Amino acid sequence: MNKYIIFDNTKLLEYIGKNSLITPCYIYDLELLEDTFLNAKKSLDKNFKNAEIHYAIKANHNPKIVGIAKKYGMGIDCVSGGEIKRALEQKVDSQHIVFARFEIELAIDNDIFAFNSESLEEIQVINQIAQRKNKQVNICLRVNPNIDAQTHHYISTGQFDDKFGIAFVDILNWLKDEYRNFANINIIGLHYHVGSQILNYQVFQSLAITTNEHIKLLRQNDINIKHINFGGGLGIDYQNPQQNPIVDFDGYFARFREFFKYSDELVLHFELGRSLVGQSGVLVSQVLFNKVTQGTHFVIIDAGMTELIRPALYQAQHKIAALIDENINQKQHYHIVGPICESSDVFAKYYQLPKLKRGDLLAIYSAGAYGKVLASEYNLRPSVQEYFI
């Protein structure tokens, strides 16, 4: 029996019934969240003497989850002013907030630790604003290392035809020729992020080796930095969440420890999101209708792409289970679809489940990351509720 309630059908159904939850809804397992954050922190500390995890709040910005990140000594990785506000509301120390891109003035006013800047023009703007406010601002330059993350092309971020980052040769030339003219910024490090949902650790090995070369070139030009931010990207097992509820953080950090030469000299940063929260959440939905079209069995549920857009957007595949005790020996292959007026509103095709009837509940697993945060009100849908168990 699995120790986590979201993977125990009986206990999950009891919780839903006892609290009269209205579907669709998200349910998060607090014990799994705590265990995952603790595991990540222990693995980090075992592998490095001077490193920090910044929780990538874009994965799930629920205040309770941000509070758990703070509890385990993690900083927050933000990409908007709203995310900075959420972190500050949860009393996260601004010196443990890193920020990429927008709402620059808000970040400067709150004295965040550093910007992760991904264009040279952005650095000019930051310097101008900092000069006007008479402040010094820390910046890590986001490098595009031209590394294939071997992931879906929508979430690849580290190749030259991706929109993110600056080619290292341009960074080196700028540091040598232009940096001296920017009086209100301090370049303290390099920032990388090659993609998301990365399962092949060879990608992280390549990133570590590439970063070694970049540091070597900087030092050959008498340019010294103190921080390296490797970003995130560590994936989760969407096919077997019950068997693999917590990712191999030890293997992830050990790969950087083994192949990055400067671990003992520099402060290292990691921006983890999906790997910390993805497996902790389940989207619960109710069967609205069954229908058969020329032999194809459809089950229409009350959750749609407005609640979980990943299948429609990324062709993502989530494990789905029927929370029922009857008909478990009677199987049927279904197209599992939502009620939204879009042909892409499909969770799975030819997916085998026990025979379903109106009112049965389904659990869509691995929905703790990029689920509720990507929800929309398209078709004037009400906001999906979240619960912690």
From Swiss-Prot:
Positions that bind substrate = R274, R310, Y314, E342, Y370
GO MF entry, a single one: diaminopimelate decarboxylase activity
Under the heading PROSITE patterns, the entry gives: ODR_DC_2_1
From which residue to which does any coiled coil extend?
Answer: none
Q: Which GO terms describe its biological process?
A: lysine biosynthetic process via diaminopimelate
Q: Where are the transmembrane segments?
A: none
Q: What Enzyme Commission number(s) appear in the record?
A: 4.1.1.20
Q: Is the keyword Lyase assigned to this protein?
A: yes
What SUPFAM superfamilies does the database record attribute to this sequence?
A: Alanine racemase C-terminal domain-like (SSF50621), PLP-binding barrel (SSF51419)
Q: Where does pyridoxal 5'-phosphate bind?
A: G233, E271, L272, G273, R274, Y370
Q: In which pathway does it act?
A: Amino-acid biosynthesis; L-lysine biosynthesis via DAP pathway; L-lysine from DL-2,6-diaminopimelate: step 1/1
Check the record and name the PANTHER family matching this protein. Answer: DIAMINOPIMELATE DECARBOXYLASE, GROUP IV DECARBOXYLASE
Task: Tell me the protein family, please.
Answer: Belongs to the Orn/Lys/Arg decarboxylase class-II family. LysA subfamily.
Q: What does this protein do?
A: Specifically catalyzes the decarboxylation of meso-diaminopimelate (meso-DAP) to L-lysine.
HAMAP family, per the entry: LysA (MF_02120)
Q: How does it assemble?
A: Homodimer.
Q: Which NCBIfam families does UniProt cross-reference here?
A: lysA (TIGR01048)
Protein name from the UniProt record: Diaminopimelate decarboxylase
Name the gene: lysA
